[in-house]
Amino acid sequence: MSGIDFKQKISFQRPFSKPIEAEEEYDIVRQFESDRGRIVNSAAIRRLQQKTQVFPLERNAAVRSRLTHSMEVQQVGRHIAKEILNRFKQDGRVDALGLTKLLDPFESIVEMACLMHDIGNPPFGHFGESAINNWFSQRLDPASCGSEPASNDRCQVSALRLHEGESDLNRLRSRIRHDLSHFEGNAQAIRLVHTLLKLNLTYAQVGCILKYTRPAYWASDIPASHNYLMKKPGFYLAEEAFVDRLRRELNMGEFDRFPLTYIMEAADDISYCVADLEDAVEKNIFTVEQLYQHLTQEWGEVTPGDLFDKTVASAFRKIAHGGARRSSEDQFFMYLRVFTVARLVPHAAQRFIDNLEAVYQGNFNQALLEDSSPAYQLLKIFKNVAFKHVFNHPEVEQLELQGYRVISGLLDIYSPLLAMPLADFTLLVQEDSHRAYPIETRLFHKLSTKHRLAYIEAIEGLQHLSPEQLAIREYYFRARLLQDYISGMTDLYAYDEYRRLMAAE
């Protein structure tokens, strides 16, 4: 393990700043304290308070939003990081691993990645993602994209249809059709912090939220060596050049992951599994007693001293012998969380250490908590019960269907902007008005300033291209403009905006 040197990974350089020199420990710490301030004060973090965790449009403040969930993940991530660093200290390896001046940054990077891990999620969570992807797939038909034009190509955008004898342009068209049809919250998070909000975070901090490592346009087979790391899109074509720079700065291979990302992922896994069940009890989907029966059934035979006995059964015994029944739900989940975290955090930390070489290189092709251990089995039964009894609940499904309709409907409403000819849309952007397009003008006025500026900046960088390339790439960034705007809405704003524009109120 002589090749492990975290100084080569924990970079405090920033993409929009001159090279930073920092030799003293506190000078390094200051860079990551600056990251913390930029992140905590960003609008994207504030919007998480009105984005769903499991129950969309929830008015009960006791039920988790994305923000409260992210704060819980932040705490578990901090705990895992401290556990890892303490074990390095006990083994006398801190200096050998290049961590002497980086203990606080190590912890801070994990914490802030945990806080940010959901900022790219659209309204209504995964159903919002599906709505965006299905809407664009129906119009761009990425499945028909090959190296040559297809007779059954159903792409509705003329600039993106494949043409004979235009192999280079066809490759670009194909990539863009795939890219726009694979919206993903993790990829949108990279776009948010770098392109839209321009937080100018350190490379290490951004690297820690690059959870998946393939571009959204990827249409080839996924190599078996990275099939877990590449199972979802991690960034868009628009951010590809930045991700290339980030990989060079952090000494990451093409499809490899930043090492501290594994900790963020484990913290999320530990947090949401218990939280989703607690929210379900708060929503009266089942009682604690019914939940205990569901969990016992999923686990199978319980033996004294096994992990189920030390966590779930132990928490249930605490309330069975407790006092006032009216607080039994709170008591049960407090104990369940404490007992689960106490067992799973050390397990995640040890997995990080046991696989340190692969984790450091970023090619450890699984999650820290994805193994054959009782810890993994415990997480799996939490997930199974949530899938069978929470996510399939009629109230949840009804709200998800509403969310799907809201996002699809908003894309329909704003779609006239995508149908405008390039010259006319350019005039609309430049003049902030177009007399021949009164509806489109009013729709354009509703787009937020930061999203419009991101579009303008992207287009200014395309003026050297041929007319054919310009038409292709301009459509891409115009579509990104709509995806950015709608995905940045909160659940409630999207719902209200849809009702207003449909004249439903």
UniProtKB/Swiss-Prot annotation:
It is an enzyme of class 3 (hydrolase). Residues 66-273 form the HD domain. Its EC number is 3.1.5.1. One of its GO terms (biological process) is dGTP catabolic process. Its cofactor is Mg(2+). NCBIfam families: dGTP_triPase, PRK04926.1. Belongs to the dGTPase family. Type 1 subfamily. PANTHER family: DEOXYGUANOSINETRIPHOSPHATE TRIPHOSPHOHYDROLASE (PTHR11373:SF32), DEOXYNUCLEOSIDE TRIPHOSPHATE TRIPHOSPHOHYDROLASE (PTHR11373). This is Deoxyguanosinetriphosphate triphosphohydrolase. It comes from Serratia proteamaculans (strain 568). The gene is dgt.
